[in-house]
């Protein structure tokens, strides 16, 4: 029997209308709570989400998930209701929320959807003894460090595939409906059970290291103490694993540590100026030609990175994944002789990268935290009857809130707009469509040609076309 005050896991997954959490919208959510041994407790939560009128859903997404815009509109909740139910689950005390690639994707979907609907985008993941985790890098670590007890599928290029549908099938887990959110959640739970049963010490260690403060204890910049690191950024050639050395804290982000990959040639760091390093670091691999890449990587301690003492990666395991231990030790000795690289790398990350500033308020989550007064005002917005939102007399400090509030009303409660607001909203929707529709329709036509022999896919594409046509009219 599960006690209410015991820690639980909440496994979850979104299906979305595109791959960019800042701009794209959720289509489906599934989540289920388990106890610490991954036994399901309570009822699964499965919901669809309605689309806003100023958004064109990706036809590719519809083909992948099989969800049509009509299904989402008919069976879905409005976005404020949808995210409120999700937030209530994620916020239950002592919850560890997790998924598969959830830190980089699903958690971002949660944050942006909370932001658009005036819910604190971050508190659910840390208040009341809560935390977040992600199984993708745990599986990568298991594969590189302790592969016994789990079956590892190969893709067509001969590399291990970490796609959830490939792993689950290879390990005898039913996963006939991949890219259905609930099927993905069940597959993730079963893979968690599998890894924990096969490699309990490894599993429990990385689970205990999901907190920033624990990871902080591993980082020793003064002595340049090497660590074992697993990350998708390290590449599949080394099975996403390497020895790294932390050299400095990021100058403006106190959650990020600047590290050097010891398996790669450190010469560019020693020889190039800060400006040259900056240019090379942000040049695509394929555009470098014969130039050596810069083996520098930021590790964000608040994103549950896989870090462990260097000895965790044994010499034998390193050899198996193609890492030359002696070369790594030589590189470490060389870097320790050049403490001046620390200032150089701090300088490298002090250079402002020229990002296009987005003028779309929906995408401005990371432009800054809201003040306590604005947070309180946003709570009032959420609790106010939609019919009374126009009459709310609150001053906001943050310039994002007013346009967010207008969009919140227009998307979810269009009946509350006065005539002038209706004209403003219609103009906004028209601008969105006119900027995208030509390219969008061309893409849709290409997909119809590509899938002309597949009746099911053609039916989905026709549904998307009809939906977009209804919006445009």
Could you tell me what each predicted segment is?
Residues 421-473:
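C-terminal non-catalytic accessory extensions
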Residues 1-42:
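Entry/capping segment at the start of metal-dependent catalytic domains
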Residues 251-427:
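Long, charge-rich C-terminal accessory regions
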Residues 76-94:
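Glycine-rich, N-terminal phosphate-binding loop and its surrounding beta-alpha-beta segment
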């Amino acid at each position: 029997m599960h006690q209410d005050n015991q820690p639980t896991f909440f496994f979850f997954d979104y299906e979305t209308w595109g791959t960019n959490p800042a701009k794209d919208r959720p289509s489906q959510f599934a989540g289920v709570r388990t106890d610490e041994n991954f036994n399901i407790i309570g009822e699964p939560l499965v919901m669809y989400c309605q689309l806003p009128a100023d958004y064109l859903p990706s036809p590719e997404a519809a083909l992948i998930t099989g969800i049509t815009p009509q299904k989402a509109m008919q069976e879905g909740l409005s976005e404020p209701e949808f995210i409120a139910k999700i937030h209530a689950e994620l916020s239950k005390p002592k919850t560890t929320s997790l998924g598969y690639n959830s830190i980089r994707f699903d958690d971002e979907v949660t944050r942006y959807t909370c932001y658009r609907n005036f819910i604190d985008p971050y508190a659910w993941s840390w208040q009341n003894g809560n935390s977040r985790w992600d199984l993708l890098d745990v599986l990568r670590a298991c594969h590189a460090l302790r592969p016994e007890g789990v079956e590892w599928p190969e893709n067509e290029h001969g590399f291990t595939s970490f796609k959830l549908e490939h792993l689950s099938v290879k390990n005898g887990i039913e996963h006939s409906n991949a890219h259905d959110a609930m099927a993905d959640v069940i597959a993730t739970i079963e893979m968690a059970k599998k890894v924990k049963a096969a490699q309990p010490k490894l599993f429990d260690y990385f689970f205990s290291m999901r907190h920033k403060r624990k990871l902080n204890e591993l980082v020793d910049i003064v002595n340049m103490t090497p660590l074992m690191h697993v990350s998708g950024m390290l590449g599949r050639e080394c099975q996403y694993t390497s020895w790294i050395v932390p050299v400095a804290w990021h100058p403006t982000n106190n959650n990020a540590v600047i590290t050097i990959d010891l398996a790669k040639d450190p010469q560019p760091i020693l020889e190039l100026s800060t400006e040259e390093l900056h240019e090379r670091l942000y040049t695509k691999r394929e555009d470098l030609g014969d130039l050596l890449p810069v083996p520098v990587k930021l590790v964000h301690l608040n994103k549950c990175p896989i870090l462990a003492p260097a000895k965790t990666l044994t010499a034998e395991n390193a050899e198996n994944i193609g890492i030359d231990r002696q070369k790594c030790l030589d590189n470490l000795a060389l870097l320790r002789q050049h403490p001046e690289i620390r200032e150089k790398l701090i300088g490298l990350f002090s250079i402002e990268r020229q990002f296009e500033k987005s003028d779309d308020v929906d995408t401005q989550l990371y432009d800054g935290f809201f003040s306590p007064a604005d947070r309180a005002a946003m709570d009032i917005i959420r609790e106010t009857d939609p019919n009374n939102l126009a009459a709310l007399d609150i001053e906001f400090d943050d310039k994002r809130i007013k346009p967010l509030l207008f969009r919140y009303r227009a998307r979810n409660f269009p009946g509350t707009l006065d005539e002038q607001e209706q004209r403003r909203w219609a103009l906004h929707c028209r601008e969105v469509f006119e900027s995208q529709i030509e390219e969008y329709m061309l893409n849709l036509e290409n997909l119809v040609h590509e899938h002309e022999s597949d009746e099911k896919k053609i039916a989905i594409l026709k549904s998307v076309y009809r939906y977009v046509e209804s919006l445009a009219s």
